[in-house]
Structure formats: C-alpha cells, structure tokens
Amino acid sequence: MKFIINLLLSTIKIITFTVIVCLTILSIFQPIYILKENEISITTRLGKIQRTENLAGLKYKIPLIENVQIFPKIILRWDGEPQRIPTGGEEKQLIWIDTTARWKIADINKFYTTIKTMSRAYVRIDAAIEPAVRGVIAKYPLLEIIRSSNDPIQRLSNGILTPQETKINGIYKITKGRKIIEKEIIRIANNNTKDIGIEIVDVLIRKVTYDPSLIESVNNRMISERQQIAEEQRSIGLAEKTEILGSIEKEKLKILSEAKATAAKIKAEGDREAAKIYSNAYGKNIEFYKFWQALESYKAVLKDKRKIFSTDMDFFQYLHKRN
C-alpha cells in the first residue's frame, strides 16, 4: 500500500512539473497569440516573410524560429506641423497652412519590407504629405485655397480665415477651390507612398492663417472688397426698385383706364335710362315735363344770384306770368 501511495505522489509531481514546464515554455516563447478585428499580422522566419493574417482569432507560430509583428488595420490619423508657404498667382502672400490627413496600410508586405515600424511610417508620411502641400499651395492664389465655391468669405477673425459662405456674388471667380486642391494634394502624396504600402485616404486643410505681417493689409483689402460688393448690391437694389415702381405705375394706369371705361359705360347706361324715363314722363304729361325741365334749367342758370335778367323772357314764363 505504501508503495502505491509513493508511486501516486511521484506521478503527481511529474505531471505538475510537466505542466509548469509547458506553461513556462508558453509564457516565454508564446507560440499562440490573439489577433483582433482591427489588426493585421505578418509572420517572418529568419527575416523573410512567411505569411500574413488579417482574420481575427487564435494564431500560431513556431517558437524561436518565427517572429510575429502586429499592425493596425484601421484608418489612422496624421497631424502635420503648420507650414509657412507663399501663395501662387500675382499676390505671393505668406500664409500658414495647418493640415491633417487619414492613412492606412494598403499593402502589408511592401510596408514591412520598406518600413517595418509604425514610427518610421509616420516619418515617411511627413516626407510624403508636407512637400505635396507646399508644392500645391504655391501654385494657387489665396482665394482658391480658402474657398470651395464662388461665395465670398464673410469674416476674418483673429487673423484666421473662416470659410463662412454667403449668397453675395464675389468679384473673383474661383476655378478649382479648396476641395479640388485637397484632392490634388492626396494624389501627389499617394504617388510618394505607393512604393511603401501606404495609402493616403484623405487630406484636409484644417486652418489657413495669414502671416502677422499681412493681417492689416489684408483687412484693408477685404474692407475694400466688401464696399465694392455693397455698392454692387445697392445698384442692383436701385434697379429693382425702378423696375418695381415702373410696374406699379403701369398697373395704376391700367386700373385707372379700366375704371374710366367702366364709369363711362355706367354713365351711358344711366343716360339711356334717364332718357327713357323722361320720354315716358313726356308722353304721359307734356306740360309737367316742360315745367320740370324749366326748373332744372333755373338751377343751372341762376346759381349766381347777382345776375340780372329780364322776366319778360319766355325762359321765365313759369316764374312770372304776364296778366
């Protein structure tokens, strides 16, 4: 019995030791690793790429022989340092451009072969985007950079151009605008990164700031531009006012003409009705009709009481009868 107990204890010790050794090997050499949804891994053997993994789950490697490096599979953010750049065109104004970008690893094999680490990736992105920004910005006038349409900038606040758009037609007509310029920067930057497995997804001009030496002159120029636009709007308003007043006068004359025509028509109808009534009255009592007509004539003739007439006239036969 004692022999059996000792044998069992020895077996338990051996099993325990084996488990501890296995766990130690697993913790040191890590032949198993977990790949997350937003990650991609590359496995190398003696510096050569063996395989890549982009599906989440448990993954395996050969300890001491294979190495695994994990990289993000998501779109990443890049923030550049503000750059002092002269604009294109005739103005050649110095401005500060602050840009941000989004990028991703498009080809893990190229990325690992040429760069290998994320820190070096950001260095290469700096070298790809910043020259592209300088080159593109230097080709265009300031208004092309800060506008995305022909609507003018409404205000300048603390030296920062705010792309707040209005409905007033500006004097300068842009041909491309900020959005197209950003796309041009993306295209050039991608040409610079296509050999290293990086894709520049988007580049945004986050802020455009005038150089301090130019703020006063730019303020004066923008005031002058606003005054020109205001004068243009006043001219448009006066033209519209003249047109509206002309329409009102035309409508008034039309209404008056129609009213006069209607009044003449009504008067004619009234005259006809009066003539009809007079005719009926004349037919019924001729003497009374003559008397009534005489009274109406007296009203018209004798308005001025200072007139002197002879009563011997037949006209006054109803006022004075001879004996």
UniProtKB/Swiss-Prot annotation:
GO annotation, cellular component aspect: membrane
Membrane protein topology class: Single-pass membrane protein
Compartments where located: Membrane
Domain of life: Bacteria
InterPro entries xref list: Band_7, Band_7/SPFH_dom_sf, HflC
Keyword annotations: Membrane, Transmembrane, Transmembrane helix
Stored Pfam families: Band_7
CDD domains for the chain: SPFH_HflC (cd03405)
Stated family: Belongs to the band 7/mec-2 family. HflC subfamily.
Role played: HflC and HflK could regulate a protease.
Record text on subunit structure and interactions: HflC and HflK may interact to form a multimeric complex.
NCBIfam families for this protein: hflC
Protein name stated in the entry: Protein HflC
Organism: Borreliella burgdorferi (strain ATCC 35210 / DSM 4680 / CIP 102532 / B31)
